[in-house]
Amino acid sequence: MKKPLLLTLLCMILAGCDNPKSLESFTPEMASFSNEFDFDPLRGPVKDFSQTLMSENGEVAKQVTGTLSQEGCFDTLELHDLENNTGLALVLDANYYRDAQTLEKKVQLQGKCQLAALPSAGVTWETDDNGFVVSATGKEMKVEYRYDSEGYPLGKTTINSQNTLSVTAKPSADPRKKLDYTAVSRVDDRQVGNVTQSCEYDAYANPVDCRLVIVDESVKPAVSHHYTIKNRIDYY
């Protein structure tokens, strides 16, 4: 037997030789929080992370940072939307997330550490048998969320008294490149926007650097916005 073939067979038997790590599904908490707080979901034993969205001029438009326990619960989550001058910082305390500055109870939890209610806004979340948030109900709206078999978010539909807004995402066929996706936004039956993202990935199949193009089709002619996303991820 030739030596290269022997080495190949040994690699297959031992499942080593620098093969990528086996894929892990997205946890219910990671998938659901990414849906609700608008960031890219991550796989594997994430300890802490940051995602920074930058405009084509190199200016920071949005940043999300979080720390997680070994059980996959978000211990802290901080969001800064510089384009809209909004922000949020949450810290886990038993069955609630508190405001990190005022310590006011903001988000009520269910199960291990899943979203249950946002009392100040009158919003409640419902989960499926696997623990994924599948709907959010408020005073004047309802949101329904969709996932694939790995827990990857496939979009959502928001229904209120005026219209129905739907976002439908289609990830790459390559299971290791889930964050390479296209998405279409519609108001009722009218397409109003589309998004395309492509990324480079680490050994856990998590995105490291991404390029994001958002096209606003609600105006004529349509306007494209180009962004880059820088991810820093530490693992247990």
Swiss-Prot record:
This is UPF0257 lipoprotein YnfC. Belongs to the UPF0257 family. Keywords: Cell membrane, Lipoprotein, Membrane, Palmitate, Signal. The gene is ynfC. The keyword Chaperone does not apply. Pfam families: UPF0257. It comes from the Bacteria. Its main location: membrane. A lipid is attached at residue 17 (N-palmitoyl cysteine). A lipid is attached at residue 17 (S-diacylglycerol cysteine). Residues 1-16 form the signal peptide. It is a lipid-anchor. It is found in: Cell membrane. GO terms for cellular component: plasma membrane.
